[in-house]
């Protein structure tokens, strides 16, 4: 299965920096996601307005097919660029996704499934999900109609929901869908990493 990171462009809240380049712990969010995807994805694509930033990383970069269409436009680009029946889609601001959880999503995809989408206690998580590439024409029509909210059309699809209880089995701390949208979020993410690193050190040195 191919995977696509939706990197978008620069974020004004971070002084014009690409959110995927922000450091959480000792690695950028992009590098953390790349580590989770390697060994899982056949190809790793990055949908971005700045392909030059990802040179030398071993990923393929793709510009938005429909600029200005937000996350749905990024999803459409991923669907049209993927060479597999399904594509794993990941927003660039999720520093705590794990290979185990992404692999679980990929394993649930099949010929009778249009989408595999987590639904946490905070609601649908459509940008950490798997979609059938055959959905591309439907997504294109939604973009052309101006209906850009991804969650609006999930009920019309053959969607395999990954519910909160199922998520909690692999994510007891509730961090999988923590997204970095502000400087406060970035600070909290780094504090969480420091705390987790300290806990791991304590376990090694009782």
Q: Where do the PLM segments sit?
A:
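Hydrophobic helical membrane-anchoring modules
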Residues: 186-206
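Nucleotide and nucleotide-moiety/phosphate-recognizing core
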Residues: 1-176, 191-197
């Amino acid at each position: 299965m191919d995977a696509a990171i939706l990197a978008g462009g620069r974020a004004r809240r971070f002084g014009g920096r690409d959110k995927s380049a922000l450091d959480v712990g000792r690695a950028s969010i992009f590098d953390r996601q790349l580590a989770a995807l390697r060994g899982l994805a056949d190809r790793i694509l990055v949908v971005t307005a700045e392909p030059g930033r990802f040179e030398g990383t071993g990923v393929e970069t793709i510009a938005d097919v429909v600029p200005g269409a937000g996350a749905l436009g990024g999803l459409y680009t991923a669907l049209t660029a993927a060479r597999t029946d399904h594509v794993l889609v990941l927003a660039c601001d999720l520093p705590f996704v794990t290979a185990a959880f992404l692999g679980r999503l990929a394993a649930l995809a099949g010929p009778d499934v249009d989408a595999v989408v987590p639904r946490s206690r905070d609601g649908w998580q459509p940008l950490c999900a798997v979609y059938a590439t055959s959905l591309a024409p439907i997504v294109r029509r939604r973009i052309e109609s101006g209906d850009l909210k991804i969650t609006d059309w999930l009920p019309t699809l053959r969607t395999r929901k990954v519910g909160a209880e199922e998520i909690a089995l692999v994510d007891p701390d509730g961090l999988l869908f923590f997204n970095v949208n502000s400087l406060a979020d970035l600070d909290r993410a780094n504090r969480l990493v420091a705390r987790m690193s300290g806990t791991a050190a304590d376990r090694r040195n009782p």
